[in-house]
């Protein structure tokens, strides 16, 4: 179990912040809190005023508890052992609640708690190559996990076949969800950030400027509702769902309080780094069983590594 606390002290346009780890001893934690506040009070007068400091002074309230029942660890391990019989499997399973809280002297208070699990594993072939797979969510489904493990087992068999060298050229390709996730993660490096867009540093600059567009089937949202992410930012601003890309066109952008002050915008609950916390890509209509038939002689790309700009 891990817990940490972030304290921020603000006065006369100045702000100071301190983060420290909490333990299981209330008396010790209270002493750490008192010492942290004292340190912040000494530091604050020494700092320069922040011209883009913007505080949310509303007394908003937010409370969400997603208390889904997670399976017992023995049950999970038994199913993994049953499904992985005869396989060289190495993985990490993590499960439990994730909690986030916020409180301000203006009277704002937010609490978010959600249970989730994540099983990340690799299946190794005798030739040293491996298939990486993952199963995560908030409700464990034995049938869904068995299917995911069976798919990984089938992919493992292909690693034993002779390698095929591809000549440079254009190929019809299918990108599996794990590969798309890598691309989406790279786009989060300032892609939807109001600050990056305002300073012309966003990888999606042409999209948001209207000079380019994606396929109309592409819609991406910041889907905070029902997600593992809280409905409030670390800056104390309530957040809601945003339509970042709708039918291939750039729409909403992530705006933190600082960017709102600097570029005369309205903050919409983004954290200071302005990266998505609950990115959701709209689903298509291609069934899993139809992928290879639709792909034909094209390339099936299960994952991507080391992406960069």
Model-derived features with residue positions:
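Active-site bordering "gate/hinge" segments
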Residues: 1-230, 237-240, 246-249, 277
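Dual-mode signal for accessory low-complexity, basic/Gly-rich regions
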Residues: 36, 40, 208-309
